[in-house]
């Protein structure tokens, strides 16, 4: 037993060294601090992402509940914890400590990995947010670019409309010029008709003059019959005729000048008409060039339509690809859901295994690592799905760009259709104008034909007049011949001279009239050629107008067909746009569904991480509970062993005390008056208060010195404390400790004092000893062993009472010879010694476990 106490004391001394003063209470505190640090590490990334905040908010009540669950274990006294830790340290193997340290390091590493994964996840989420912001900025830029393109296209369309309007205005101006030229031609025709009327009037005047000349000639013939009588009258008539001839010459000259001027005017007008017709030909050629340009535009539109068809087919192929990719994403999501379900099932199984048995901790750790790997794979799949989503968003952006391009092309086609419709309306207006012009020209043609017929009639009339003039000349010549014959018959030479003069005059007049007729014929030929040229020009212009009308009709028909085809293509493009919009909406919906599913996957991942954290926390709790139970079990075993040792020691001490009491009783039977010396037992009991006084004097020292002093006392056997020879040994130990011969002086003083004083001093010393023991007990153990000590004190007191009863019975048997006073004094002494022995036994019992510790 002494060896056991020595080993326990050596263990306590090693644990109470300066380096390990606080070591007994450290293991459980360290575990709690580790758990707190782990919770703090788990909570630390909560400031990074909203998902981790959710996880923190979910895990915080669990952590609080875990702290609340652990809190009832805290009121355990530090004395018991120190004892348990000392016992555990005495029994624990280094393998368990290394295993615990490895487990802690693994847990720290796992927490660090989880925190790093959460940080990476937060970074990935931030990058996704940044990518979304950049995508929004790009969409805004694209919108701005599209707006700018729309503005440019609107400006270009406005410029095109302005150019078309300018061309239309130029055409209208040309038409107005043509109208003006037609009006000038009409005016020229009117002037020509007026000139013809004037010529007719002049011819009528000439005819009248010729009729007057015929009358004069008849008068001259009548007068020539009586030539002899009226020669003078004939001479006057000749003068009159000569004057008339001069007047006729003047009239002919004026008519010639007028006809030359009118001919020059007609030539100038015809040249102007030729220039106008050339301009019309140039405008017609320009119109043909415009028609060719429009045909090129129509061809370009057909090419654009083919490109739109190709884009439509590409859009269909892209939509099919997106549908296939969406199906693949749905399959991947289903696989992810299956993996999550399997992960939840595995987590439930892990929880059941953790709740069921503590032996399967290693299996649960391996499953946790598998779950981490699955989480990593899930995160990689989520990252891949996010990349696929980004690619899909990019492709959707490209599809939207193509759709916007198609919309722009459709708008362009609509604008071109509107322009074509406007041109069609204008062409219809031009056709109406052309028809009206044709009608007007036909009316003018009919007028010109009527004028030509009238001019022909006038020519015939002029021919008839010329014939009448020729007949008149023949008549005049016949009359001259008759007059000549008469004159010859009469034989008057004067008349012959007159007749010669008349012949000359007649020849001159004939020549003049012939010249006038030639000129009139030439003028008539010129007018006929001009009329024929005007007819030819009118017919050619009519043919040109008919050709233009036919071309316009054909062009209008073509334009109507093109408009119809363009309308059909526009309807088809509208349907395609609607389909593409529907497909885009479906793609957006699918993308939103995939995003929602991804969010659900992320939430489930967060929930899995939370469940992993909870599982880890529960596993830590279970490990702590196991360690606590093991320590409690070991402490209970050590307490049982200590109690057994204490029982053995107490039994031995009780036996020793009973022997001491018997010896004391036997010694008291001897006469107390011999030499006034104290008994051996009283001397031994006097030594104990001195030791207690020494410990009380040095109570300000550390606990280590007290424990060392108690060791020196407890290592001695109880028989040495009682015997006289050993009392000297105790005195030697006290001398070695204090370096002074206090015991010998105290013995001498005690021999001089009386027994009552010794008893009072012993009572005071026992009281001090009791107080010092109470102080040591408070320093060593706070409050928890009071019940055990009270039970032990009651047992010791009961045993002491039994021993006292036996001793009193022995005294009653042997001490009948004593007086009553002696009996009273003996009873008082026995009671005092009883109390002293009980208190000393309690002190020794209380100090024994301290020394063992």
From Swiss-Prot:
It is found in: Plastid, Chloroplast. The modification Phosphoserine is found at residue 790. Residues 402-465, 698-718, 732-753, 778-788, 797-807 have a biased composition (Basic and acidic residues). It comes from Arabidopsis thaliana. Its main location: plastid. It comes from the Eukaryota. Residues 94-670 form a coiled coil. This is WEB family protein At5g16730, chloroplastic. The keyword Metal-binding does not apply. Residues 754-763 have a biased composition (Acidic residues). Belongs to the WEB family.
């Amino acid at each position: 037993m002494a060896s056991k106490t020595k080993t326990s004391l050596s263990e306590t001394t090693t644990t109470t060294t300066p380096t390990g003063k606080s070591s007994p209470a450290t293991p459980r505190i360290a575990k709690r601090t580790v758990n707190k640090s782990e919770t703090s590490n788990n909570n630390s990334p909560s400031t990074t992402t909203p998902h981790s905040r959710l996880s923190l908010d979910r895990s915080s009540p669990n952590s609080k509940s875990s702290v609340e669950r652990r809190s009832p274990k805290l009121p355990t006294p530090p004395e018991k914890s120190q004892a348990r830790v000392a016992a555990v340290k005495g029994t624990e193997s280094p393998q368990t400590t290394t295993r615990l340290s490895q487990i802690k390091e693994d847990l720290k590493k796992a927490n660090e990995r989880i925190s790093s994964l959460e940080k990476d996840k937060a970074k990935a989420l931030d990058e996704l947010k940044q990518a979304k912001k950049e995508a929004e900025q790009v969409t805004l830029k694209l919108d701005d670019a599209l707006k700018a393109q729309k503005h440019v296209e609107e400006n270009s369309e406005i410029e095109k409309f302005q150019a078309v309007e300018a061309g239309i205005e130029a055409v209208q101006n040309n038409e107005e010029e043509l109208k003006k030229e037609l009006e000038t031609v009409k005016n020229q025709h009117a002037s020509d008709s007026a000139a013809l009327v004037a010529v007719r009037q002049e011819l009528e005047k000439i005819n009248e003059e010729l009729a007057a000349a015929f009358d004069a000639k008849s008068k001259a013939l009548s007068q020539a019959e009586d030539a002899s009588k009226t020669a003078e009258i004939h001479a006057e008539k000749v003068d009159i005729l000569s004057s008339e001839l001069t007047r006729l010459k003047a009239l002919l000259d004026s008519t010639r000048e007028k006809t030359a001027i009118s001919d020059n005017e007609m030539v100038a007008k015809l040249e102007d008409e030729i220039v106008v017709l050339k301009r019309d030909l140039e405008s017609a050629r320009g119109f043909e060039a415009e028609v060719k340009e429009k045909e090129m535009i129509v061809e370009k539109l057909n090419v654009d339509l083919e490109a739109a068809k190709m884009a439509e087919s590409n859009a269909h192929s892209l939509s099919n690809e997106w549908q296939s990719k969406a199906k693949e994403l749905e399959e991947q999501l289903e696989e992810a859901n299956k993996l999550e379900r399997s992960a939840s099932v595995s987590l439930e199984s892990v929880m059941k295994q953790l709740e069921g048995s503590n032996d399967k901790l290693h299996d649960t750790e391996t499953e946790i690592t598998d779950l981490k790997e699955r989480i990593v794979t899930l995160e990689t799949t989520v990252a891949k799905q996010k990349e696929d989503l980004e690619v899909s968003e990019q492709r959707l952006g490209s599809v939207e760009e193509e759709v916007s391009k198609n919309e722009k092309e459709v708008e362009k086609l609509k604008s071109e259709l509107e322009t074509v419709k406007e041109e069609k309306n204008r062409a219809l207006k031009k056709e109406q104008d052309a028809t009206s012009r044709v009608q007007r020209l036909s009316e003018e043609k009919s007028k010109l034909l009527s004028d030509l017929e009238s001019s022909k009639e006038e020519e015939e009339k002029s021919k008839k007049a010329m014939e009448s003039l020729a007949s008149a000349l023949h008549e005049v010549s016949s009359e001259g011949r008759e007059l000549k014959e008469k004159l010859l018959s009469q034989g008057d030479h004067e008349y012959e001279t007159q007749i010669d003069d008349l012949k000359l005059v007649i020849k001159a007049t004939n020549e003049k009239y012939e010249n006038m007729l030639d000129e009139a014929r030439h003028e008539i030929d010129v007018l006929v050629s001009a009329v024929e040229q005007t007819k030819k020009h009118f017919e050619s212009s009519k043919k040109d107008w008919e050709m233009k009308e036919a071309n316009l009709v054909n062009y209008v028909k073509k334009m109507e067909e093109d408009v119809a085809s363009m309308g059909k293509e526009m309807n088809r493009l509208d349907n395609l746009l609607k389909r593409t919009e529907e497909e885009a909406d479906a793609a957006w919906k699918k993308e939103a569904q995939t995003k929602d599913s991804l969010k659900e996957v992320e939430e489930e991942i967060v929930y899995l991480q939370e469940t992993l954290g909870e599982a880890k926390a529960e596993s830590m709790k279970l490990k702590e509970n196991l360690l606590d139970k093991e320590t409690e079990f070991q402490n209970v075993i050590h307490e049982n062993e200590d109690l057994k040792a204490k029982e053995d020691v107490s039994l031995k001490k009780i036996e020793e005390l009973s022997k001491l009491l018997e010896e004391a009783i036997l010694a008291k039977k001897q006469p107390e008056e011999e030499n006034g010396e104290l008994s051996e037992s009283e001397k031994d009991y006097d030594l104990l208060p001195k030791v207690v006084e020494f410990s009380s004097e040095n109570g300000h020292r550390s606990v280590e010195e007290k424990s060392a002093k108690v060791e020196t006392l407890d290592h001695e056997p109880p028989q040495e404390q009682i015997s006289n020879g050993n009392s000297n040994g105790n005195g030697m130990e006290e001398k070695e400790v204090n370096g002074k011969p206090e015991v010998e002086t105290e013995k001498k003083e005690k021999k001089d004092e009386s027994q009552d004083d010794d008893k009072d001093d012993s009572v005071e010393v026992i009281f001090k000893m009791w107080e010092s023991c109470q102080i040591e007990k408070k320093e060593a153990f706070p409050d928890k062993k009071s019940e055990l000590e009270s039970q032990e004190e009651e047992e010791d007191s009961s045993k002491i009472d039994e021993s006292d009863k036996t001793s009193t019975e022995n005294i009653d048997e042997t001490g009948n010879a004593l007086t009553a006073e002696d009996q009273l004094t003996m009873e008082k002494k026995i009671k005092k010694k009883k109390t002293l022995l009980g208190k000393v036994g309690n002190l020794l019992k209380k100090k024994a476990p301290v020394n063992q510790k």
